[in-house]
């Protein structure tokens, strides 16, 4: 991964925080290259400040500033959250950590040609010891998939 690859989290709950902690602990990303947004601004600011991560006011700000966008919201929120940023996501690597939201559903809610993969991580990723189960079906290029595998 490039030292300046920027990673954004849309949703910054427990799993997103665990992933961010793992990225930071493995030096896979610098804190100033990680962006996050969440529904509760005050809680987001507390959680990003202690990590040195940049808080964003909304999904659009997060997506615009990121090369890789991690969708870390509940499955029932996914269509609403992505509806406002799908044109921005088209030029990004999109990773979902929402269990039960498969490739086919993303094909319905994202613009055609958006590069995305669905994963299921576990919380030991916070110390760089967890696993990411990746759905076999995805729309990443070989180099994008290699980048995702390298990061996680």
Regions found by a protein language model. Name each.
Residues 105-115, 131-152:
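Internal alpha-helical scaffold of NAD(P)-dependent oxidoreductase catalytic cores
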Residues 12, 16, 44, 66, ...:
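A general structural signal for well-ordered alpha-helical segments in protein cores
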Residues 7-9, 69, 95, 148:
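Hydrophobic packing within well-folded, soluble alpha/beta domains
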Residues 23-24, 49-52, 83-87, 108-113, ...:
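Short, glycine/charged-enriched secondary-structure capping and boundary segments
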Residues 1-57, 64:
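NAD(P)+-binding Rossmann beta1-loop-alpha1 motif at the extreme N-terminus of oxidoreductases
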Residues 35, 56, 95, 117-119:
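Hydrophobic/aromatic beta-strand patches that form the interior of the parallel beta-sheet core
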Residues 54-110:
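Rossmann-fold NAD(P) dinucleotide-binding segment
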